[in-house]
Design a protein with these regions (language model features):
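Short, surface-exposed amphipathic charged segments that create phosphate/polyanion-binding patches used
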Residues: 71-74, 126-133, 177-182, 204-206, ...
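A conserved active-site cap/scaffold subdomain adjacent to cofactor or substrate pockets
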Residues: 165, 183-251
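Internal helical hairpin/lid segments
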Residues: 226-317
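Glycine-rich, charge-decorated loop segments at or immediately adjacent to ligand/cofactor-binding or catalytic sites
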Residues: 97, 171-182, 225-228
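Short, conserved secondary-structure transition motifs
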Residues: 168-175, 255-258
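Metallocofactor- and cofactor-centric catalytic cores in central/energy metabolism, strongly enriched
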Residues: 1-130, 144, 148, 154-157, ...
């Protein structure tokens, strides 16, 4: 299949592995940011192909995983109301809050519905004028423009019964936090291609310059990731720190200007708490005051309450590249996709879920 098979070409993949092997004179620690990249690495055993030359650790690029417990609890509170239709993407239903999850709220009679587009939520509001329809808007810069468009459309139609519980986060501030940590191990980053398709790659230049760290914008197929690893290895071996774009078939320096403009109209940058990590300055998006009539937090008067993560869940350390899922004593025993302790196990993009699906015994699980 064109635009797919060539990025899974075993001959090309083997060539990249040989290049990494020939370049590396010492083991380097690299972090892929996006959860989709993590799943590709696990599915195809890319970490094993470069073992001894490169150690791959996994970053906080799973939006479901970093949505704080407090925000999940707000969603649960709204979803349990009899006058509300609560609308969400499917992967949020099993994410644990402090006491329960949306799936259980639905099982107990809450009107919780799964959609594949935020515009579906707008249609539900249009079709149910007597009910409050709340869309759970979660995601990075990739999904934020579509959510912004839903809010724009709701304002255009003057839909009084539509609102959004928004929990959007931004990638560069999270990378800055990791690099600024005194226990940071990461020496190079594979930046998320889908995020950069929207935002462009220029905003990563400041990180390269401030921390003298190489960053390569990478794609999501096996040869994309192997080429990105080779590019980072070459930079590190040569003592360079540059921003490079491996995913040039999708990413430009400036990104999608129209999408960025829409984000600027609907949202403003704000501090945001990340699950297990804490508050990161200027790392999120909140609705501008002009969109307050569609802001679920304001409409329902939700209060912030501090909630602690389960003590045995180490997903916060996994998301910062300090631990791996197999280091967790609860992995695949007390924590599984059916009974997750943390969001990294239940999300379709979570690192713990990737290890459980492909590598739960420490060896690659055969996948057809």
């Amino acid at each position: 299949m064109k635009y797919l098979d060539e990025y899974r070409d075993p001959v090309l993949a083997a060539a990249f592995v040989r290049r990494i092997d020939s370049l590396s004179t010492r083991p380097w620690v690299l972090m892929e940011i996006c959860g989709g990249q993590t799943h590709t690495i696990m599915r195809y055993g890319i970490d094993d192909l470069v073992k001894g030359k490169v150690e791959l650790v996994h970053g906080p690029g799973c939006p479901v995983c970093v949505t704080p417990v407090e925000m999940i609890d707000k969603a649960l509170e709204i979803a349990a109301r009899p006058d509300v239709i609560f609308v969400s993407y499917g992967d949020m239903l099993r994410v644990p809050g402090s006491k329960t999850d949306l799936f259980e709220v639905k099982a107990k009679g809450g009107d919780v519905r799964i959609v594949y587009s935020p515009m579906d939520a707008v249609k539900i509001a249009r079709d149910n004028p007597s009910r409050q329809v709340v869309f759970f808007g979660v995601g990075f810069e990739t999904t934020a423009p579509a959510n912004a468009m839903a809010l724009w459309q709701a304002r255009l139609e003057r839909l009084p019964n539509f609102s959004m519980l928004a929990s959007h986060v931004l990638v560069p501030p999270a990378i800055r936090l990791i690099l600024g940590s005194p226990v940071n191990r990461v020496q190079g980053f594979i930046a998320p291609g889908h995020v950069c398709t929207i935002m462009g790659c220029s905003e990563y230049e400041a990180l390269v310059n401030d921390f003298h760290v190489p960053i390569v914008v990478g794609g999501f197929e096996p040869t994309d990731l192997l080429e990105s690893i080779a590019m980072l290895t070459a930079q590190l071996e040569e003592g360079r720190a540059e921003l490079e774009n491996q995913y040039a078939r999708s990413v430009t320096r400036s990104g999608n200007i129209a999408a960025q403009n829409l984000l600027g109209i609907v949202f403003e940058v704000a501090d945001r708490k990340w699950r297990g990590i804490g508050k990161i300055p200027l790392s999120g998006l909140r609705l501008r005051e002009e969109f307050a009539p569609w802001d679920a937090e304001k409409i329902f008067g939700l209060e912030e309450a501090e909630v602690e993560e389960p003590a045995e869940c180490i997903s916060a350390l996994v998301l910062q590249g300090l631990k791996k899922p197999l280091d967790c004593p609860a992995f695949a025993t007390r924590c599984s996709p059916d009974h997750p302790l943390g969001a990294s196990m239940v999300s379709s993009e979570g690192a713990c879920a990737a290890y459980h699906q492909y590598k739960r015994h420490g060896e690659l699980v055969n996948v057809q």
